[in-house]
């Protein structure tokens, strides 16, 4: 085969591969959304727009477009913006884009977070993961699993994310620590205190304790025996 022929063959193979990748991305959109006709045309156009501005394969872009459209019910520029955010989030954190959209969507619904705050939430999750070393998948799971308790305690979503990241960074067993926090809420309520007041008073007392034994005694009074050790370690 001549050099020219080999070059033409190479271009042909590359074109076929590129077409196949695009087709796979479009197929993913159809599978995830069930869209047809003009609705599908709009989604594939958005996929093309995202794909043309990011160093990602079309399969990943198709996943993002399909999942974001299905869960956030957005189209056009808003769909493209949010899809880009999730593609970048997944790339930075080494996660699956479909799982990322799924988990974050559940968190936002559980906490009634407006879709306009998606970028801020993704940024916070990424920042805490980078600061503490916890994987975003694990962090998201912790926040989802304990969201009812967090809301009962009056903690905001950013506070909950930060708390669980710090637990992990300090080697604290989150299950035991949450048991301690639940006990703290019960004690605070019985004494007519708010959760913030009870935690603030106790943390100050634990930090200022003269001995580890004294710190443990103080923590036990508020967090209970099961959670005292973990909470003292965290504080």
Which ranges hold each PLM region?
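Extended alpha-helical or coil "stalk/linker/tether" regions that are enriched in polar/charged
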Residues: 159-235
């Amino acid at each position: 085969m001549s050099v020219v022929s080999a070059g033409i063959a190479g271009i042909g193979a590359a074109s076929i591969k590129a077409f196949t990748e695009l087709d796979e991305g479009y197929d993913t959109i159809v599978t995830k959304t069930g869209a047809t006709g003009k609705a599908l045309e709009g989604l594939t156009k958005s996929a093309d727009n995202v794909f043309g501005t990011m160093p990602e394969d079309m399969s990943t872009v198709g996943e993002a477009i399909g999942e974001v459209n299905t869960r956030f019910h957005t189209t056009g520029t808003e769909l493209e913006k949010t899809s880009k955010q999730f593609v970048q989030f997944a790339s930075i954190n080494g996660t699956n884009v479909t799982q990322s959209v799924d988990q974050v969507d559940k968190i936002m619904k559980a906490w009634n977070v407006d879709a306009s705050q998606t970028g801020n939430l993704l940024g916070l999750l990424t920042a805490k993961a980078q600061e503490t070393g916890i994987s975003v998948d694990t962090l998201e799971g912790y926040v989802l699993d304990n969201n009812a308790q967090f809301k009962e305690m009056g903690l905001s979503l950013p506070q909950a994310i930060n708390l669980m990241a710090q637990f992990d960074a300090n080697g604290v067993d989150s299950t035991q620590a949450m048991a301690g926090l639940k006990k703290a809420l019960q004690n605070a309520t019985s004494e007519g205190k708010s959760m913030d007041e009870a935690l603030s008073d106790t943390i100050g007392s634990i930090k200022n304790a003269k001995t580890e034994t004294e710190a443990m005694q103080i923590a036990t009074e508020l967090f209970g025996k099961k959670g005292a050790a973990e909470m003292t370690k965290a504080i």
